[in-house]
Amino acid sequence: MDAIKENWTTVKEAVRREYSLSDISYHTWVEPLEFHNVVNDVVSIIIPSDQAHALNYISSKYKSFFQVTITEMFDHPYDISFIWKRM
């Protein structure tokens, strides 16, 4: 969905605001995330390769934050998938 891609920074900032993320948490875990695509109502989010070791942590900690935020912002139910970017 182009709307999610076009508003990706706004999505991340909404997650930061709605869930009261500290500056450190936001800059470490959320800011580096990149929108990849939407297929069958699943939003794929790229985790940079230097954070690949934290895939499980990021998924367990932030998946629901992104799912709720994106669903509310775009008025459509989405699931979230985190993938890591290979160099």
Describe every region a protein language model picked out.
Residues M1-M87:
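Intrinsically disordered, low-complexity basic tails and flexible linkers associated
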